[in-house]
């Protein structure tokens, strides 16, 4: 009977559990009037254990924490989240965000009476984060109403690098909008900064941002043109010195001397970074594409006209980037100034080439050969500049082994020392010159013809460490004549080390014996190529064509089964040798007799 009563009690408890489950799943623990439909089906797992086991289950902080996490994931507002019957709290629904946060904090403080330290710390951290977020949102929304008082109003959300709205009289409210922009950038929210001096406070600002800002600023009017030019130059100098761009709200109208000083500092920085060559008198990597004479410089900033000219407002970097690319026909015309067979240009055309540069740019060039004046810069093709020193260093690497008897490389003539007059041949003409021409019996690889050694009349690859490709235009490249020529005897040990021991040549145990080299070269029936001997002649009758011998030390243990065909007979029969000689040496059998020891 006791067991039956227990069953009845269990059934009653199960019915109550199903009722509770149905109530929680349908209405989320709330009356039907305020029931909220969750995003997904309400599973039993996130609820505390005393709901879906029985009412007397001991509660701990883990249950409450899981329940709160489930409520936050479901997306329910804090005021209408389901609470259990033991913790029903009369929470008023507060309309504003501040009241909602305060009520949530009060609930959390009431609920945290029976929690342990870890859950308290987690909840305090979460509350502090939500409080900071709400304060920041309220302050930003309150301060964004200040610039919205003007008839223009605020625009939609946009990235910070976009152009601000063009407002004629927008000089009245720069301060509050910049503060708002700083706070919103800390929250990683892209809001437009509505002012005439929009500055993105970011370390990742690029030249595109400066160009966009300068183009917008240039259309404002004529009264703040000098201030805009100073701000843009200051931005360029800060960007080049690799610091994040700060807002220049306190910058005054600079005079023309300050503008020229900033431009000169920018020019020096560009020269130090972009025109640094490999040596003091080396050319600075200027290819003929970059040696085109630039256009005459525009008017200086002290001669600014009264009309709003957009090109006058651009900073130095913007002028560099807005330069049109050079015409390929003009480049081809300048490349055809040199004769294709000679290394140095014609003197008259070289002087004519230099005479086309302005005098101010000749003074600014100096020893480095850079061509950058105060107002302009001659970087007509900036993406091609970093590749030129790499090509030149590669050329000097190839020419490192070929020296003249005087000790200087061949291509280093007096044109190279002259600084700006240095003009390499074009890449097209170099590729035309380097076509492989097979003259005589000497194989010429795809290297320039000037890369032959001066002391030995041989191609350059004879001095390198790797063997040449097998070109049979000369009889000295055949293997059977290599021992007769002392000039090419240096490659013999390399080719001996080239072949692995495949069982065909047992003489290769001593690879540097000249008699064995002569034997295995001249015993062949035809001319063997580089590494075809073990594969072309597998059945040639060599006298030592036997399995590899064991070591002569009798203390070595015999090899185990599976190591290869070491023995012709198994050890159990006691046959240790044949008539051809001993095949193995074992501590159990003697190699002197027939190997049978009983």
Curated annotation (Swiss-Prot):
InterPro entries with a match to the protein in the record = DUF4688
Coiled-coil residues are none
Short name of one Pfam family for this protein? Answer: DUF4688
Database matches in PANTHER family: CDNA SEQUENCE CK137956
Question: Can you say what this protein is called?
Answer: Uncharacterized protein C1orf94
Species this protein is from: Homo sapiens
């Amino acid at each position: 009977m006791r067991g039956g009563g227990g069953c009845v009690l269990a059934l009653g408890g199960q019915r109550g559990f199903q009722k509770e489950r149905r109530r929680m799943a349908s209405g989320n623990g709330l009356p039907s009037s305020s029931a909220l439909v969750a995003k997904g089906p309400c599973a039993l797992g996130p609820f505390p254990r005393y709901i879906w086991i029985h009412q007397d289950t001991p509660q701990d902080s883990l249950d409450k924490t899981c329940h709160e996490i489930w409520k936050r994931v479901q997306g329910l507002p804090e005021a209408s989240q389901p609470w259990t019957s033991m913790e029903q709290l009369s929470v008023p629904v507060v309309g504003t965000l501040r009241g909602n946060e305060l009520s949530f904090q009060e609930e959390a403080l009431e609920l945290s009476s029976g929690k342990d330290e870890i859950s308290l710390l987690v909840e305090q951290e979460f509350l502090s984060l939500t409080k900071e977020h709400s304060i920041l949102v309220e302050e930003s929304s309150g301060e964004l109403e200040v610039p919205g008082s003007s008839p223009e109003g605020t625009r939609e959300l946009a990235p910070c690098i976009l152009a601000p709205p063009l407002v004629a009289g927008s000089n009245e409210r720069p301060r509050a909008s910049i503060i708002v922009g700083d706070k919103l950038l800390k929250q990683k929210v892209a809001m437009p900064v509505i002012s005439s001096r929009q500055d993105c406070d970011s370390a990742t600002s690029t030249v595109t941002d400066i160009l966009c800002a300068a183009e917008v600023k240039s259309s404002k009017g004529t009264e703040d043109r000098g201030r805009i030019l100073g701000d843009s130059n200051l931005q360029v100098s800060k960007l080049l010195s690799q610091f994040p761009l700060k807002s220049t709200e306190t910058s005054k109208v600079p005079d023309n001397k300050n503008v020229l000083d900033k431009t000169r500092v920018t020019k020096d920085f560009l020269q130090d970074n972009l025109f640094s060559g490999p040596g003091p008198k080396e050319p600075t990597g200027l290819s003929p594409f970059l040696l085109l004479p630039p256009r005459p410089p525009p008017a200086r900033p002290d001669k600014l006209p009264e009309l709003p000219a957009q090109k006058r407002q651009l900073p130095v970097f913007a002028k560099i980037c807005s330069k049109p690319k050079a015409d390929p026909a003009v480049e081809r015309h300048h490349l055809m100034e040199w004769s294709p067979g000679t290394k140095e240009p014609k003197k008259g055309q070289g002087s004519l080439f230099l005479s086309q540069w302005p005098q101010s740019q000749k003074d600014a060039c100096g020893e480095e050969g850079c061509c950058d004046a105060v107002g302009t810069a001659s970087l007509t093709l900036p993406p091609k500049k970093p590749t030129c020193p790499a090509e030149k260093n590669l050329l000097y690497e190839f020419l490192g082994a070929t020296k003249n008897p005087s000790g200087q490389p061949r291509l280093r003539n007096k044109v190279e020392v002259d600084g700006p007059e240095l003009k390499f041949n074009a890449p097209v003409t170099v590729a035309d010159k380097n076509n492989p021409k097979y003259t005589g019996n000497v194989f010429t690889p795809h290297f320039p013809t000037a890369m032959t050694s001066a002391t030995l009349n041989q191609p350059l690859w004879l001095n390198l460490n790797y063997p040449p490709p097998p070109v049979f235009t000369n009889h000295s490249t055949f293997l059977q004549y290599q021992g007769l020529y002392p000039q090419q005897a240096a490659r013999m040990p390399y080719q001996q080390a080239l072949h692995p021991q495949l069982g065909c040549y047992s003489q290769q145990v001593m690879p540097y014996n000249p008699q064995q080299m002569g034997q295995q070269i001249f015993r062949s029936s035809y001319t063997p190529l580089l590494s075809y001997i073990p594969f072309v002649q597998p059945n040639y009758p060599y006298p030592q064509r036997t399995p590899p011998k064991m070591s002569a030390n009798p203390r070595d243990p015999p090899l185990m089964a599976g190591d290869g065909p070491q023995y012709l007979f198994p050890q159990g029969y006691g046959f240790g040798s044949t008539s051809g000689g001993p095949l193995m040496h074992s501590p159990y059998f003697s190699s002197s007799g027939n190997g049978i020891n009983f």
